[in-house]
Amino acid sequence: MKSFTTIFKRNKISFKENLFLIILSIFLSSEILFAQQAEPTFAWPEGKQIAISLSFDDARASQVDAGTALLDQYGVKGTFYVVPNSVRQRLEGWKKAVASGHEIGNHSFNHPCTGNFPWSRQKAIENYTLKKMRNELILANKDIKELLGVESEVFAYPCGQTYIGRGENTKSYVPVVSKLFLSGRGWLDEGPNAPQFCDLAQLTGMEMDGKDFEQILPLIENAKKSGAWLVLAGHEMGVSGNQTTRLSMLKKLIEYAQNPANGIWIAPVGTVAKYIKGQKG
């Protein structure tokens, strides 16, 4: 027969374990409650659950040769971050895109990126100054205005790189972008934008090039968990190829987004950015 002392010790241990679990449960419940109180659900227009923006870089010919026609078919407005010299190569197509209501953003004058890319060696951001970058962004805006008659309010960082200079002299040009534009978008980021928290000058941009809708859907579902803003970014628009957003994927994505049951607001970057800015006061 077990001794009274042994039974007492075991009951004492059991009591301590139960007490620990009760305290842990109360702590976790209070943490969850605090998180819910600290970060209320963001109110998207018309009760939507999330926002999605479709954005495309570089003013590539395929965007106006094939891409905008698909967007127009569904009444969807995209955001096109352009480089002036590329616009000149398809000027009439870009004028038509503007007339259709697509947003034209600034993607710099020379598309400077790190000199680690051989093609960018002569315009490496390591050799830029903040003054040079600012002047070129203003020059690009001026050219876009002259070519297309619109003011670019949004910007996308070439190659997603937000710095200039080297080593101890490296500087962020995010403050420059913040002063000149409503928003600045990155590239190859890993998550959507939290509307209550995001820095409009450093919006995340998630790649949609080379992906089927089945690969994009998890990004949408993840954004729904927190009521986020998913900014998708691409380049060429076509059937297939390098750095190409597939038209077949876009068709499925748009049809999914336009189904009221899915609770998605699909709008240009500038439109969503202005809404968020207005909500923040």
Predicted features along the sequence, with ranges:
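N-terminal secretory signal peptides that target proteins for export/translocation
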Residues: 1-15
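Bacterial N-terminal signal peptides
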Residues: 18-31
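Boundary/entry segment of secreted carbohydrate-active catalytic domains
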Residues: 36-64
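C-terminal domain-boundary segment and adjacent tail
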Residues: 38-46, 86-89, 181-197, 217, ...
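Structural recognition of the beta-strand scaffold that forms the well-ordered cores
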Residues: 51-55, 78-82, 103-106, 153-157, ...
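Solvent-exposed loop/turn segments at secondary-structure junctions
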Residues: 58-62, 85-88, 104, 109-114, ...
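Catalytic domains of cell-wall/extracellular-matrix polysaccharide-remodeling enzymes
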Residues: 66, 88-89, 115-216, 249
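Acidic (Asp/Glu)-rich catalytic clusters
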Residues: 68-75, 87-109, 177-178, 191-197, ...
